[in-house]
Amino acid sequence: MTAKDSFIRTADEEHARTMKLLRAYPTDKLELKPHDMLKNARDLAWVFALERYLGTRIWNDELTKGAPGKPPAAPQNWNELLSGVDKAHQDFMGLVRKASDDDLKKKVHFFVGPKQLGEMSRMDVLWFLLHDQIHHRGQFSIYLRMSGAKVPSIYGPTADEPWM
């Protein structure tokens, strides 16, 4: 299995896990905001789409041309938001699926510190974005618990889905 194939398999598996978590969220709690410094649940869920939006701009090395542009706003309708997250993933992964090994080795500009750009390979950026998705999914699982919903199994059992 190539590094590209491994990434695609892992990214698609993680996307399915993320969608499982998002689908478990109660639509009457989208404005839940656990702290003033945090996003509400709707906006945090939309981060999964925004990461793919940003990923496309990074893929095209647009960060050297200034801010990546105003990202699309989160849909108010939860099902539209879920569809948007799924579409963003599929569109972004389309770039990856078409990429050659040389495309993945190409250096692009990405944040390496506060207000600081550095060069990274596209493959390294892909893994960074995937890890960031997993991080935000962990945050979202806390929102799910705080909303009173059941937290589904992601990698193993949860209090709501014991395996034994």
Question: Model-derived features: where do they sit?
Answer:
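Active-site rim elements
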Residues: 3-8, 75-82, 126, 130
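Short, contiguous alpha-helical
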Residues: 8-12, 16-19, 27-71, 111-164
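C-terminal ligand-sensing/allosteric alpha-helical core of TetR-family HTH transcriptional regulators
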Residues: 14, 21, 47, 51, ...
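Helix-adjacent hinge/juxtasegments
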Residues: 57-101
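Acidic catalytic patch
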Residues: 98-113
